[in-house]
Curated annotation (Swiss-Prot):
Family: Belongs to the ATPase A chain family.
Alphabetized NCBIfam families for the sequence: altF1_A, ATP_synt_6_or_A, PRK05815.2-3
Protein name per its UniProtKB record: ATP synthase subunit a 2
Record GO terms (molecular function): proton-transporting ATP synthase activity, rotational mechanism
Pfam hit, one: ATP-synt_A
Taxonomic source organism: Picosynechococcus sp. (strain ATCC 27264 / PCC 7002 / PR-6) (Agmenellum quadruplicatum)
CDD domains in the record: ATP-synt_Fo_a_6 (cd00310)
Transmembrane segments: 15-35, 78-98, 107-127, 169-189, 194-214
Length: 233
């Protein structure tokens, strides 16, 4: 059993390397895109909905409600990005029940790419909510001396997101490999079930942390506005 999918090489020619991380990442994305296209064509608006549509509506509504609870804002601006992050990580982790499949989230390159996507999304959402000047001013608060620390904080949060997901998935794979070597008959079934639960939790935690980072700028702005209104009153 491989601890990380980076070690599984499917093709290599000079500096071109196609490993399991790349293959299974694209496979996961392809499944999500094809599934989304199929679902979009099959959606119905009738009193009696098919079971799969009921299930998907429950999932989307759950994501919607969690965004509203965490951000205390309208969920629509965050739903597509955060929902995509959650569904990608969830699908990548749940596919581990397929023999031979290795979750791409067990590779630091994949988790770093996801963290960089969040890193880029933070200023995009911040500028959209507060304007470019308002967002840039947040790096100078409460004093301009904090500017280098604010910048370091942005990079450290990105690094923490990447390393946290990678470390948790890799440690889970390592634990499964150790237990499989000790008790090869009964452990695989139990570890598969535990891995499914673990994968759901990791997808949820990563999405929530990303949501908190993205929404923090607008939340701070709203708090400052409410404080100033109270002082004026």
């Amino acid at each position: 059993m491989q601890i990380t999918p980076d070690n599984i090489i499917f093709y290599q020619y000079q500096f071109v390397v196609i490993n399991a991380t790349l293959v299974y990442t694209w496979l996961t994305m392809a499944l999500l895109v094809i599934g989304a296209a199929w679902v979009t064509k099959k959606l119905v608006v009738r009193p009696k909905l098919p079971p799969w549509q009921n299930f998907l509506e429950i999932v989307v509504d759950g994501i919607y409600q969690h965004i509203a609870e965490v951000t205390q804002q309208e969920p629509e601006p965050y739903l597509a990005f955060v929902g995509t992050l959650f569904l990608f990580i969830l699908t990548a982790n749940l596919l581990t029940v397929v023999p031979g499949y290795q979750a791409p989230t067990g590779s630091l390159s994949t988790t770093t790419a996801l963290a960089i996507a969040v890193f880029i999304a933070v200023p995009i959402y911040g500028i959209r909510q507060r304007g470019i000047l308002g967002y840039l001013k947040s790096y100078l608060q409460p004093t301009p001396i904090m500017l280098p620390f604010q910048i370091i904080g942005e990079f450290s949060r990105t690094l923490a997101l990447a390393v946290r997901l990678f470390g948790n998935i890799m440690s889970g794979n390592l634990l499964a490999a150790i237990l499989l070597a000790l008790v090869p008959l009964f452990v695989p079934v139990a570890m598969n079930l535990l891995g499914l639960v673990f994968g759901v939790i990791q997808a949820y935690v990563f999405a929530i942390l990303a949501l908190v980072y993205i929404a923090s700028a607008a939340t701070v702005q709203e708090k400052k506005q409410s404080i100033s209104m109270e002082e004026n009153s």
